[in-house]
């Protein structure tokens, strides 16, 4: 998350952020902390929306689950923060994880396509919700 924050702040400084900022930085031991997520929210410029993609790591629930819960809390607290709940989609579709490391979906072309479609649709649903939602005042 900290490396992503550097890129995010550079994009803010260069004024290249789109209205909807999608943040998907929560896998492979991302260095999650509530404070870093708070910094993403507080740094978001006025007139923008933040879409947080919940992380999934089927090997353990520890930090990944805590990050997901905090992202859901942020979406309840701020009406310009939205959640693409990849974690929920991932656990509802165990077939995409068969024969994998439980971080990267798809052990064959069929399950790779299915996982990619599920991931994209999860984000699209959040974008659709944000399209009718508020921006940061």
What is each residue range found by the language model?
Residues 38-42, 81-83:
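Short, functional N-terminal and low-complexity linear motifs
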Residues 61-137:
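Catalytic His-Asp segment of secreted/periplasmic serine-dependent ester chemistry enzymes
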Residues 19-25, 49-54, 82-85:
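Structural recognition of the beta-strand scaffold that forms the well-ordered cores
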Residues 44-47, 78:
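Acidic-histidine catalytic/liganding microenvironments
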Residues 1-39, 58-65, 69:
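Conserved SGNH/GDSL esterase-like catalytic core that processes O-acyl groups on lipids
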Residues 18, 32, 45, 107-108:
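Alpha-helix initiation/capping motif
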Residues 42-43, 73:
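Alpha-helical scaffold elements within enzyme catalytic domains, especially in hydrolases
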